[in-house]
From Swiss-Prot:
Top-level division of the source organism's lineage: Bacteria
This protein's name: ATP-dependent Clp protease ATP-binding subunit ClpX
Organism: Streptococcus pneumoniae serotype 4 (strain ATCC BAA-334 / TIGR4)
Gene Ontology BP, a term: proteolysis involved in protein catabolic process
Alphabetized Gene3D superfamilies for the sequence: 1.10.8.60, ClpX chaperone, C4-type zinc finger domain, P-loop containing nucleotide triphosphate hydrolases
InterPro entries, per the entry: AAA+_ATPase (IPR003593), ATP-dep_Clp_protease_ClpX (IPR050052), ATPase_AAA_core (IPR003959), Clp_ATPase_C (IPR019489), Clp_protease_ATP-bd_su_ClpX (IPR004487), ClpX_bact (IPR046425), P-loop_NTPase (IPR027417), Znf_CppX_C4 (IPR010603)
S-S bonds: none
Record: residues binding ATP: 120-127
Keyword terms: ATP-binding, Chaperone, Metal-binding, Nucleotide-binding, Zinc
Length: 410
């Protein structure tokens, strides 16, 4: 209940001592009263403490070499991309700390360096971003660029990306404003041509323009209930200037653009180096000009100054992914069966066959789990009920479906 000035009995705030005539409202509780001014003060103190906690969490950002070490525990291969990401993430949070602690007289303004990751499906783009966010203990959200539309069209507004980050941060705005957002499949909203279209491009340039605003840094109005179905809802203001955006895509066919550019240079200058070599890695040669030619607007490219190119994973890479990282799939399934007191072994040839299947299906690392699930289905179904089974051995023939796994009993 609340009391106001019409009450005959004078009531005082238990915290500041003011009476109901000196404040707008006093709220009664169990044997205590609090005025609206003390409520507002308490809220402000809580907000300040939350900001301090967020800043304290990021005050000692791991050095690039430490971030690389963390990534190496979970991500196999992609050494150049991991180095680029480690440096970019370290500099990003160092920049935030600089802005939070610098004197007003300092005129150096460190600008944000968002990241563009280019690499084939299943090469580890999402997992890299996810691992970085987890290692820094910052909120992380994933968005699919193909689901976005510009304002006024049916689809998801770009502001909903920020809503996802807020949800992960339990609507702690200060914490969300220092999070990481990964926007996947940015290549799917590339312009259909380099020429500016007179007509509206719902799934291409318009979405890129909308993304540009939040990526470069703006105060965005985020609908807490999402979408456009609740026009009367009170918006949440989120400042995106300190949110790190990592944008990724496969960019299928961009190698041809790179080859064409390098080939022209060869003709023009008489060089006969890696531009002619079909076996060279053109992904590492990508520059802003190639990305623009692919269909990404130059303004957006300018807000993504850090390029991290990921290579197609080889059979050897995939085999290592299966067994080496801390969360390797082989270790996960061994742990699952260990709860039934059963050991699980994979022959080297079996792991090679799983990797070959993933490459044939063009699914990369993300397809490994589904292949193991197919291989392990009967084992996971039958073995828990067979008390005498102590070891399961997966062979190449088990993976290709020509034979059953080898079971050893007690």
């Amino acid at each position: 209940m609340s009391t106001n000035r019409k009450n005959d009995m004078m009531v005082y705030c238990s915290f500041c001592g003011k009476n109901q005539e000196e404040v707008q409202k006093i709220i009664a509780g169990n044997n205590a009263f609090i005025c609206n001014e003390c409520v507002e003060l308490a809220q402000e103190i809580i907000r300040e403490e939350l900001v301090e906690e967020v800043l304290a969490d990021l005050s000692e950002v791991p050095k690039p070499i430490e971030l690389l070490h963390i990534l190496n525990h979970y991500v196999i291969g992609q050494d150049r991309a991991k180095r680029a990401l480690a440096v970019a993430v370290y500099n990003h949070y160092k920049r935030i700390n600089f802005h939070d602690t610098r004197e007003e007289s300092e005129d150096v303004d460190l600008q944000k360096s968002n990241i563009l990751m280019i690499g084939p499906t299943g090469s580890g783009k999402t997992f890299l971003a996810q691992t970085l966010a987890k290692s820094l203990n910052v909120p992380f959200a994933i968005a699919d660029a193909t689901a976005l539309t510009e304002a006024g069209y049916v689809g998801e507004d770009v502001e909903n990306i920020l809503l996802k980050l807020l949800q992960v941060a339990d609507f702690n705005i200060e914490r969300a404003e220092r999070g990481i957002i990964y926007v996947d499949e940015i290549d799917k909203i590339a312009k259909k041509s380099e020429n500016v279209s007179i007509t509206r491009d719902v799934s291409g340039e318009g979405v890129q323009q909308a993304l540009l605003k939040i990526i470069e840094g703006t105060v965005a109005s985020v609908p807490p209930q999402g979408g456009r179905k609740h026009p009367q809802q009170e918006m949440i203001q989120v400042d995106t200037k300190n949110i790190l955006f990592i944008v990724g895509g496969a960019f299928d066919g961009i190698e041809e653009i790179v080859k064409q550019r390098l080939g022209e240079k060869v003709i023009g200058f008489g060089q006969n180096n890696k531009a002619i070599d079909e076996n060279s890695s053109y992904m590492q040669e990508i520059i802003a000009e190639d990305i623009q030619k692919f269909g990404i607007i130059p303004e957006l490219i300018g807000r993504l100054p850090v390029f991290a190119a990921l290579e197609q994973l080889t059979v050897d890479d995939l085999v290592r992914i299966l067994k080496e990282p801390r969360n390797a799939l082989v270790k996960q399934y061994q742990t699952l069966l260990s709860y039934d007191d059963v050991e699980l072994e994979f022959d080297d040839e079996a792991l090679q066959e799983i990797a070959n299947k993933a490459i044939e299906r063009k699914t990369g690392a993300r397809g490994l789990r589904s292949i193991i699930e197919e291989t392990m289905l009967d084992v996971m179904f039958e073995v828990p009920s067979q008390e005498n089974v102590k070891l399961v051995r997966i062979t190449k023939e088990t993976v290709d479906g020509t034979d059953k796994p080898i079971l050893e009993t007690a």
